[in-house]
Swiss-Prot record:
Control of this protein's activity: Allosterically activated by GTP. Inhibited by UTP.
Keywords: Allosteric enzyme, ATP-binding, Cytoplasm, Kinase, Nucleotide-binding, Pyrimidine biosynthesis, Transferase
GO molecular function, one term: UMP kinase activity
Subunit: Homohexamer.
Binding site for UMP: 52, 73, 134-141
Cellular component per GO, a single term: cytosol
Function description: Catalyzes the reversible phosphorylation of UMP to UDP.
Positions of the UniProt region annotated as Involved in allosteric activation by GTP: 18-23
Pfam assignment, any one: AA_kinase
InterPro entries for this protein: AceGlu_kinase-like_sf, Asp/Glu/Uridylate_kinase, Uridylate_kinase, Uridylate_kinase_bac
Name of the protein in question: Uridylate kinase
Amino acid sequence: MSDKKRVLVKFSGEALAGDSGFGIDTAILKFIADEIKELVTNGTEVCIVIGGGNIIRGVSAAKDGIIRRTSGDHMGMLATVINSIAMREALERGGLDVRVQSAIKMEAICETFIVGRANRHLEKGRVVIFAAGTGNPFFTTDTAATLRAIEIGSDMIIKATKVDGVYDKDPNKFKDAKLLKSLSYEKAMSDDIKVMDDTAIALAKDNSLPILVCNMFKQGNLLKIISEDAKALYSIVK
């Protein structure tokens, strides 16, 4: 493996939707692509996982029982493929070499996930987008992102959100909410702090994978995090 820093960045599908709450806002897509390009230009090996909540959520689709949970989750996996293709387009328009790898075989659209091939792409400076979650129902894209990060030997997983990091309570509801700069995996799970679901956190803990939570809309913040800039704004779970 290369000596370069390797990171997996996890974006929610809702983040792509912008104010509309549904679909894909191409202005946001371009903003994210520019932030990723900064990392690649500065020598970082980057892979990405995007949720599908801007299109459909498996849990929500199955809520009234008309659609089975397994089918709902498969629909959600397909939504992540749509988002991944959109992100590939934005990154390629920015001059980057990109590959989408899906956990579910769909040769006409993208590659099938193979860890060795993903590693080779990253070593060649390509951005790799992992789509379709784990390929199995009942697992979130946070868990999929953690799994892929471990499989490809990522130094960290960055969860890009709409807030500056992890707070002791909801900063949108409480003005006195405090940003937690660092917390343990155990605290993140026991206090039910919504960093990721418990399966993802437990997987990260078992493999000593740091989880960094940051605001995706702070321009240049991703690069500051990777560069270990003191001005970087994030929380770390380790």
